[in-house]
């Protein structure tokens, strides 16, 4: 620490003028008071951060190092200001105001009072009396009073100096250094001891806080051992991809094989042992320093908060449980076993036999070599700038040569300062020797106090042991009397227990006989109830069985009707193909007849044929047209019939599917009722749960029986209704046939109109012979039309009867069939068929 401390000028004058034992003590006390008074008027550190917080210690320390304002005994102008507490603010201001140039390290603002203070402190301050450490009661009290007024840096330095003294008292007696603040506090405490005739009783050292800090550290170390940090170790060639792990990883066995090839493994082991021991020593020093820093601001006599005490108690119990010997042995065994497993693990990779790894390593080494050759014999100046040594020497000679003169001046000042430091160290050594003598006297007094306290504790221990023994004997006698009373009570209870067991056995026998008789009666009653419930359930399930049989019969009839409809559809398809073939033949005949008419017209004009031959050819043309129209009408009727049958087949298929699903549903209902019957019989109930049946089926068993009776009535009335419908169909059929026979008479109105249209286009000449042929053709065509109408009507009646048997009717509108008819004489018969279908649907 610094020898040039924060003592003000007015205090330095007082210290320099004092001489002698008593006057020196009073002067140091006055300097202490002046320091207290000056610390009261300190201002708070300035705010330099944007968040409104002061600069941290680390930032101030770096700023001091950068600009040469750090407190060091190697410099005479250690602070540069009159007030040591304002040094950090001054350094920060200088760091902010100075420009970053070559001369930025120069001290721009040096207070001349600082040099005066340094010159006065050297020859005038000489310690003749011994100075004690901060272990006495008075020094501790003065430190606790001044604790809130001193800066954190002074407290930390004081704690550090104390720990260093306790750890290395015997080895470093001549190289210790303390600040003036701590020395003044110690002298103020020592003055009281000099004035008093008898040494006061030293207060016992409170190690509780030190132990708490050590326990916390031990707890953190145990936690790190139990839950180690998982770090990613990378081996092999380094790459620029810092985030990605290296693709090559070595096992412990492989690394041991590699390290076995090193020439000097023993030397490395020795170095490792030395390194580990040095680290342990550094850690122990660090822990001691941390403990000192933890307790430096806490007063031993203050009461601890209840919450803090409770937390400490919980931590102690936790550590006592965690750090038991059994837990530690188990943990050590587990760790050793895991380490053995890790050492024996093989990562299935080898270093020198892996060709891919060697190729990758060679490639990476070549790329690194190429990158290095670019900056060979160049120095990295930072920020991506590489300069050769020649350039650096040029720049240095141009920039540093003006500063060499100032450096020489500073060297001379440094030599003078070294001489002053040597003088001060000699004076300090004298004062430290006196301090050590006083410390020895304090230690001897402490030893005497310890012996007296030990003797007093022994006497108190003996008296307390005698009292405890007497109380224990009285307690034993009192407990013996209680045990005798309890033994007599126990014998009485045992006799009562035997009598009670006999009584309970007799009662159990009687109760067992009564329960056996009740069980037999209840079994007979249950069997009778089960038989009655089964009969009742069979009666309830009978309608379901009947309904299932009816549904299966209906399904069978629907399947037969579907087969008949499919056969009728195939027959009609064959007839449609035949009619199409005939129509194509008639079309060919018409084309041939047209060609023939053209030729005949040419011949008639050229040769002048007679009217009779021409009319015969025209009559042939009309007959062919009539036959074609008839075939087209038959084709349209059969196509309509085919469509109707296809619709009926689809309806029957859907009905058959619906009946199949209904049959499955009824079967499931039947199975459900049987299952409920079994459950009820197993439980011993008389009837089925009607509420559950209603939720599952939608009605109760009685409602289901009534509904099945109405369905059976409808099934019985269905055949009579079908017979009436069939009788009405036969009457309608006879009426349609009579109307068609009338329309197919000798006149033949539709065919004659077609003949007239044909004759008007060809010629206006007519004879008796062609008229007779036309009438004959009309008669034949009328008969064929009547036969076709009968077949169509028969097919219509079949479809209507099928619909009546299914209790459903399908309405066919005339508009849906008009586009299939050609408009010849067969149109009237088709319209009559449609009227018959509509009348049948109305009935």
Swiss-Prot record:
Keywords: Acetylation, Cell membrane, Membrane, Phosphoprotein. Residues 1-53, 120-174, 717-843 are annotated as: Disordered. One of its GO terms (biological process) is eisosome assembly. The modification Phosphoserine is found at residues 2, 88, 130, 182, 401, 584, 710, 763, 775, 816, 828-829, 838. It is a peripheral membrane protein. Residues 127-137, 163-174, 798-810 have a biased composition (Polar residues). Transmembrane segments: none annotated. It holds the Pfam family Eisosome1. GO terms for cellular component: cell periphery; cytoplasm; eisosome; mitochondrion; plasma membrane. InterPro entries: Eisosome1. Residues 33-46 have a biased composition (Basic residues). The modification Phosphothreonine is found at residue 720. It is found in: Cytoplasmic granule; Cell membrane. Belongs to the EIS1 family. Required for normal formation of eisosomes, large cytoplasmic protein assemblies that localize to specialized domains on plasma membrane and mark the site of endocytosis. This is Eisosome protein 1. It comes from Saccharomyces cerevisiae (strain ATCC 204508 / S288c) (Baker's yeast).
């Amino acid at each position: 620490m610094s020898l040039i401390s924060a003592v003000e000028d007015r205090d330095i004058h007082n210290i320099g003028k004092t001489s002698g034992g008593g006057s020196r003590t009073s002067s140091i006390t006055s300097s202490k008071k002046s320091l207290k008074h000056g610390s009261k008027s300190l201002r708070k550190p300035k705010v330099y951060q944007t968040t409104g917080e002061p600069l941290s210690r680390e930032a101030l320390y770096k700023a001091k190092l950068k600009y040469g304002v750090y407190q060091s005994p190697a410099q005479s102008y250690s602070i540069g200001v009159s007030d040591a507490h304002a040094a950090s603010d001054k350094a920060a201001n200088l760091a902010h105001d100075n420009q970053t140039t070559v001369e930025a390290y120069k001290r721009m603002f040096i207070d001349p009072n600082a040099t005066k203070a340094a010159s006065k402190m050297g020859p005038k301050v000489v310690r003749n009396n011994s100075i004690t450490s901060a272990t006495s009661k008075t020094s501790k009290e003065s430190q606790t009073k001044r604790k809130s007024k001193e800066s954190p840096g002074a407290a930390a330095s004081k704690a550090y100096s104390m720990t260093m003294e306790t750890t290395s008292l015997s080895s470093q007696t001549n190289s210790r250094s303390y600040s003036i603040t701590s020395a003044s506090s110690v002298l103020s405490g020592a003055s009281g001891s000099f004035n008093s005739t008898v040494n006061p009783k030293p207060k016992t050292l409170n190690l509780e806080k030190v132990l708490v800090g050590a326990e916390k550290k031990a707890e953190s170390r145990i936690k790190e051992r139990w839950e180690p940090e998982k770090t990613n170790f990378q081996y092999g060639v380094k790459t620029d991809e810092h985030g990605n792990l290296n693709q090559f990883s070595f096992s412990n066995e492989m690394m041991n094989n590699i390290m076995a090839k090193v020439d000097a493994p023993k030397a490395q082991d020795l170095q490792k042992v030395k390194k580990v021991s040095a680290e342990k020593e550094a850690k122990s020093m660090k822990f001691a320093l941390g403990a000192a820093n933890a307790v430096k601001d806490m007063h031993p006599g203050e009461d601890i908060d209840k919450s803090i005490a409770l937390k400490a108690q919980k931590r102690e119990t936790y550590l006592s449980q965690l750090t038991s010997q059994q837990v530690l042995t188990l943990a050590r065994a587990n760790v050793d076993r895991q380490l053995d497993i890790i050492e024996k693990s093989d990562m299935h990779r080898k270093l020198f036999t892996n060709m891919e790894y060697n190729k990758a390593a060679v490639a990476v080494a070549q790329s690194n070599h190429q990158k290095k050759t670019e900056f060979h014999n160049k120095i990295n100046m930072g920020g991506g700038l590489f300069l050769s040594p020649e350039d650096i020497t040029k720049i240095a000679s141009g920039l540093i040569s003006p500063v060499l003169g100032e450096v020489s001046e500073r060297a001379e000042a440094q030599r003078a300062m070294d001489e002053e430091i040597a003088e001060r160290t000699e004076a300090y050594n004298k004062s430290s020797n006196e301090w050590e003598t006083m410390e020895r006297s304090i230690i001897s007094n402490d030893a005497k106090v310890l012996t007296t306290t030990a003797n007093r504790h022994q006497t108190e221990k003996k008296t307390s042991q005698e009292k405890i023994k007497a109380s224990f004997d009285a307690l034993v006698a009192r407990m013996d009397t209680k045990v005798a009373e309890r033994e007599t009570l126990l014998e009485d209870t045992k006799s009562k227990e035997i009598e009670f067991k006999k009584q309970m056995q007799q009662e159990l026998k009687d109760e067992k006989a009564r329960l056996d008789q009740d069980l037999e009666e209840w079994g007979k009653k249950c069997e009778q109830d089960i038989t009655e419930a089964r009969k009742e359930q069979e009666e309830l399930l009978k309608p379901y069985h009947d309904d299932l049989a009816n549904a299966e019969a209906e399904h069978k009839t629907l399947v037969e009707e579907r087969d008949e409809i499919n056969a009728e559809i195939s027959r009609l398809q064959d007839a449609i193909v035949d009619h199409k073939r005939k129509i194509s033949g008639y079309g060919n005949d018409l084309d041939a007849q047209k060609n023939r008419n053209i030729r005949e017209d040419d011949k008639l004009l050229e040769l002048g044929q007679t009217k009779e031959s021409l009319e015969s050819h025209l009559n042939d043309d009309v007959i062919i047209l009539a036959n074609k129209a008839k075939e087209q009408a038959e084709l349209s009727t059969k196509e309509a019939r085919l469509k109707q049958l296809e619709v009926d087949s689809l309806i029957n298929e859907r009905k058959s599917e619906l009946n199949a699903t209904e049959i499955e549903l009824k079967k499931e209902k039947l199975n459900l009722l049987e299952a409920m019957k079994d459950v009820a019989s197993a439980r011993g109930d008389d009837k089925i749960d009607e509420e559950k049946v209603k939720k599952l089926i939608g009605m109760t068993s009685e409602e289901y029986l009534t509904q099945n009776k109405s369905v059976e009535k409808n099934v019985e009335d269905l055949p009579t209704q079908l017979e009436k419908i069939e009788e009405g169909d036969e009457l309608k059929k006879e009426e349609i046939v009579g109307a068609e026979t009338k329309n197919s008479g000798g006149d033949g109105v539709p065919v004659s109109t077609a003949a007239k249209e044909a004759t008007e286009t060809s010629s206006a000449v007519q004879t008796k012979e062609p008229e007779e042929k036309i009438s004959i053709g009309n008669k034949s065509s009328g008969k064929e039309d009547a036969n076709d109408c009968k077949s169509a009507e028969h097919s219509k009646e079949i479809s209507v009867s099928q619909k009546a048997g299914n209790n459903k009717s399908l309405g066919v509108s005339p508009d849906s069939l008009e586009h299939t008819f050609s408009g010849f004489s067969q149109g009237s018969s088709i319209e009559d068929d449609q009227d018959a279908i509509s009348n049948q649907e109305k009935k």
